[in-house]
């Protein structure tokens, strides 16, 4: 049997959310632009948003980082108990996003086996980093995950698939 590092997962998606306020960029973006994140806070204020469930890494050095992490965990608990999410058990989800130039990019939401991952430069593992990992950011990421009732991964896996046999065939099954 062929094994793969990519697997199905129990996936939570917001139901009845204003997606213009729900979706935010990954926590490791705009790390030198606190004004970007301040604008996102203004835009999402009072709304259910993924922003309330992540720790933007621009705040990693702040004195109140532990308080922010505690708030993230509380928000996760309340979103789950309030029924904000629809759960898709043992699933993979086909997604499309339209870039600003109009090009549509397709992908699959799933899980990777972290035992197959190695972020070190030159790694030959099944799953490896395409950009340098900032090792100093790992401890706070672990702190956010420890005791958290939900995971909000922010990675994108690129697949070497010259035959276009992984993602492209799924387009015909949209909506199933």
Role assignments for model-derived ranges:
Residues 2-176:
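A cross-family signal for N-terminal binding/gating loops and helix N-caps
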């Amino acid at each position: 049997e062929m094994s793969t590092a990519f697997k199905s997962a129990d996936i939570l998606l917001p139901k009845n959310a204003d997606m213009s306020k729900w979706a935010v960029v990954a926590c490791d973006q705009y790390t030198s632009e606190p004004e970007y994140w301040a604008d996102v806070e203004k835009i999402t204020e009072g709304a259910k948003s993924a922003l309330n469930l992540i720790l933007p890494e621009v705040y990693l050095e702040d004195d109140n980082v532990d308080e922010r992490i505690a708030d993230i965990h509380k928000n996760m608990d309340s979103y789950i108990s309030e029924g904000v999410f629809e759960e898709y058990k043992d699933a993979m989800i086909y997604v499309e996003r339209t870039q600003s130039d109009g090009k549509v990019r397709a992908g699959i939401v799933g899980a990777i086996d972290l035992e197959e991952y190695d972020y070190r430069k030159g790694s030959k593992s099944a799953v490896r980093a395409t950009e340098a990992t900032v090792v100093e950011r790992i401890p706070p990421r672990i702190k956010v995950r420890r005791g958290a009732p939900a995971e909000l991964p922010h990675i994108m896996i690129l697949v070497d698939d010259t035959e276009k046999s992984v993602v492209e065939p799924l387009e015909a099954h949209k909506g199933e």
